């Protein structure tokens, strides 16, 4: 989707709210680093609505998380969520792929997986670099955070986001292998 339609704006609002609130919940694995199932929201909404929606859901949703949590807005990590959402939405650019219509093939899934993994790595490295250069955070702390966040996001993407997105696409297929018995 390239046009900013009412449907897309509503999807961005719902996605950002879900990502923002669910982002408050997670399992600690390193200093200020959590496994957050909310990343699955970015995966699904990016695949459904495209890179612009994924980007905005990540940016707005992470800002909501940081604001509600009260620890201040960490812009490097906010931008990294936007980058991840954008990467997840790139699958929409593949002709023939549609979660809504249940159309995809193995190449689409491979593309989605690779784009998602590369997006996660780029985003987390960006956030860590931003924290060191702009925020003045100690290098050794950021290395632990970057490694932890990368592992956490990859796990959530592969275990929740990808299977949920594929499951939605499968459930939206227009044809089945069911046969009417006579």
UniProtKB/Swiss-Prot annotation:
Segments crossing the lipid bilayer: 9-29, 40-60, 71-91, 114-134, 142-162
Membrane topology listed for this record: Multi-pass membrane protein
GO CC annotations, alphabetized: plasma membrane
Record localization: Cell membrane
InterPro entries according to UniProt: ECF_substrate-spec-like (IPR009825), UPF0397 (IPR022914)
Cited Gene3D superfamilies: 1.10.1760.20
The keyword Nucleus belongs to this UniProt entry's keyword annotation: no
Alphabetic keyword roster: Cell membrane, Membrane, Transmembrane, Transmembrane helix
Family to which the UniProt record says this protein belongs: Belongs to the UPF0397 family.
Family matches, as HAMAP family: UPF0397
Protein name: UPF0397 protein BcerKBAB4_2500
